[in-house]
């Protein structure tokens, strides 16, 4: 059963990582496709207008060429242009000279007027190939978007050598060359503009939907990770409590069965120590027996301290005062080992709800462990600061020998110790007290470079069950 549960947990973990990655990839690919396809419909509509304009321009050139062969004049060319301007979507036709003066126009009243200034004609620089641009023109009393197509007007192209000299065509200063003319045709681009607006709107909607999917995936992923973390922490807490319950039954039996004999052993050891000469072997053995009885009694007391619920006396406390007081308690021991204690009070630190005696017990345990890890000549640094609006952080950093990576995970486990004379219950008690305050404690260390213990405490503590 445990194997099946482990297999399901592993599958859920991999799915929680692969599914967001797959969604990110699909959203990215779909976004690329949407962006790449943006403008295709409007480009196709614009190309249709360009091809239609090219056909009409060539038709006008052909008609003009035929009319010239039949000795037709500007009047016939004007009539032909007016008839072609009646095509659907055509706003106007115009043929101008190099200075922008209208020679023929679909609106006869425009003939002889200036369509564009010479400087504008120079900027347009019409050539033999069709060019286009977007303009706004007045039509039926309102301004409409238009697609203007223009190029050199070439009705004589291919006629030389056939005896045609360009009848009815304006001549340049050099009588051998006709004056350069430009043909303009303007199409109603309202549908093209609507198509572009629709494309932009649809693309924006699709990209917004993709962004929403991406954001929802990110939120779901982070919420799932948060749920998994909370779930793991809850399972760890349940395991610890189950272990503490089992240890509580054991501790109760141990305390009952061991303490009474220990008291007798200690009493007898003191009795023999008093009855033997000081400095003798028997006297020293009796003292060793008494000390070992005290140590075993202390182990039983710490075990009971660990397994029984901590009854906190919560009150508003100033962390600066707690830290300063606890450092003073170990200052003599640190000074004898040439260990510097560093702490700068944080005057902006808010008061928190905590049990001052229990908190002092926690800090003393961390200081003593740090002093033991340093040995001689080192530094212990304590810092306190706020974390957001509802938590404070206390860090205890030492310059000791550090903790091996394989020991970090077990450092808060009861009876795990790296000291020859340690019981392995100190940090377990520390963790229990911090968790009773509704906080947490973590440790980071690089072997040979010291350790950092970090405590998170809520500003308003509620004793945990």
Curated annotation (Swiss-Prot):
Residues 36-203 are periplasmic. Its EC number is 2.7.13.3. The chain crosses the membrane at residues 15-35, 204-224. It is a multi-pass membrane protein. SUPFAM superfamilies: ATPase domain of HSP90 chaperone/DNA topoisomerase II/histidine kinase, Homodimeric domain of signal transducing histidine kinase, Sensory domain-like. InterPro entries: HATPase_C_sf, His_kinase_dom, HisK_dim/P_dom, HisK_dim/P_sf, Sensor-like_sf, Sig_transdc_His_kin-like_C. It catalyses: ATP + protein L-histidine = ADP + protein N-phospho-L-histidine. CDD domains: HisKA. Residues 1-14, 225-465 are cytoplasmic. Its main location: membrane. Residues 253-461 form the Histidine kinase domain. GO terms for molecular function: ATP binding; phosphorelay sensor kinase activity. Autophosphorylated. This is Sensor histidine kinase ZraS. The lineage of its organism: Bacteria, Pseudomonadati, Pseudomonadota, Gammaproteobacteria, Enterobacterales. The gene is zraS.
């Amino acid at each position: 059963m445990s194997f099946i549960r482990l297999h399901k947990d592993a599958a859920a973990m991999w799915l929680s990582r692969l599914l967001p990655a797959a969604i990110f990839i699909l959203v990215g690919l779909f976004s690329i496709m949407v962006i790449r396809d943006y403008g295709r419909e409007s480009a196709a509509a614009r190309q249709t207008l360009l091809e239609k304009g090219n056909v009409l321009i060539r038709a006008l050139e052909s008609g003009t060429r035929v009319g010239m062969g039949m000795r037709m004049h500007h009047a016939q060319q004007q009539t032909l242009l007016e008839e072609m301007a009646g095509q659907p979507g055509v706003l106007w036709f115009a043929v101008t000279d190099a200075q922008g003066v209208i020679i023929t126009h679909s609106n006869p009243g425009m003939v002889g007027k200036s369509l564009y200034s010479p400087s504008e004609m120079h900027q347009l620089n019409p050539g033999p190939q069709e060019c286009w641009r977007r303009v706004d023109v007045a039509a039926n009393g309102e301004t409409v978007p238009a697609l203007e197509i223009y190029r050199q007007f070439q009705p004589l192209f291919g006629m030389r050598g056939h005896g045609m000299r360009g009848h009815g065509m304006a001549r340049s200063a050099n009588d051998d060359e006709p004056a350069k003319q430009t043909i303009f045709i303007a199409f109603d681009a309202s549908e093209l503009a609507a198509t572009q607006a629709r494309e932009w709107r649809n693309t924006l909607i699709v990209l917004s939907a993709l962004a929403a999917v991406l954001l929802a995936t990110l939120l779901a992923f982070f919420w799932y990770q948060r749920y998994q973390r909370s779930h793991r922490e809850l399972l760890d807490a349940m395991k610890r409590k189950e272990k503490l319950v089992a240890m509580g039954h054991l501790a109760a039996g141990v305390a009952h069965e061991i303490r009474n004999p220990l008291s007798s052993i200690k009493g007898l050891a003191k009795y023999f120590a008093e009855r033997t000469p000081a400095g003798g072997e028997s006297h020293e053995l009796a003292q060793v027996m008494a000390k070992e009885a005290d140590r075993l009694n202390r182990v039983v007391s710490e075990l009971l301290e660990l397994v029984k619920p901590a009854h906190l006396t919560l009150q508003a406390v100033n962390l600066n005062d707690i830290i300063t007081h606890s450092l003073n308690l170990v200052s003599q021991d640190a000074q004898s080992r040439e260990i510097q204690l560093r702490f700068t009070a944080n005057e902006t630190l808010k008061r928190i709800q905590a049990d001052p005696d229990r908190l002092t017990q926690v800090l003393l345990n961390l200081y003593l462990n740090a002093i033991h890890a340093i040995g001689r000549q080192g530094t212990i640094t304590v810092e306190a600061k706020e974390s957001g609006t509802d938590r404070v952080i206390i860090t205890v950093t030492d310059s000791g020998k550090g903790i091996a990576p394989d020991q970090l995970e077990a450092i808060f486990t009861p009876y795990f110790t790296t000291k020859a004379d340690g019981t392995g219950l100190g940090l377990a008690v520390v963790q229990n007290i911090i968790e009773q305050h509704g906080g947490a404690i973590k440790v980071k260390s690089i072997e040979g470079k010291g350790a950092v213990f970090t405590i998170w405490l809520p500003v308003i503590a509620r004793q945990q069950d």
